A protein has these predicted regions:
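Key DNA-contact positions within bacterial/archaeal DNA-binding proteins
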Residues: 33
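Short, amphipathic alpha-helical "recognition" segments used to contact nucleic acids or chromatin
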Residues: 2-19
Length: 81
């Protein structure tokens, strides 16, 4: 289980290169809208819990697959791999 803040998720989203939402969706075999919803706080996915708190709220993720792929893509873009 991963705990982070909504603002941290937005930072990850903002660091992703163009087309990443579709790339994440394709890799995980899910809809691109589900990936967009994940980063917008509108996610209805099981295991995504948003609570009031600092930095836009506390997000608890039971499944971090979208975040894991996003962090890998952001790291690769930052390091030009």
């Amino acid at each position: 289980m991963i705990r982070t803040t909504f603002n941290k998720l937005r930072e990850v989203k903002d660091s992703l290169p163009h087309g990443s939402m579709d790339a994440i969706a394709a890799e995980l075999n899910i809809a691109a809208d589900d990936v967009r919803d994940f980063f917008s706080g509108a996610s209805k996915m099981d295991g995504y819990h948003l609570e009031a708190g600092p930095d836009g709220g506390i997000v608890v993720l039971e499944n971090s697959a979208i975040l894991d792929v996003a962090l890998r893509l952001a790291w690769a873009a930052k390091n030009a791999l």
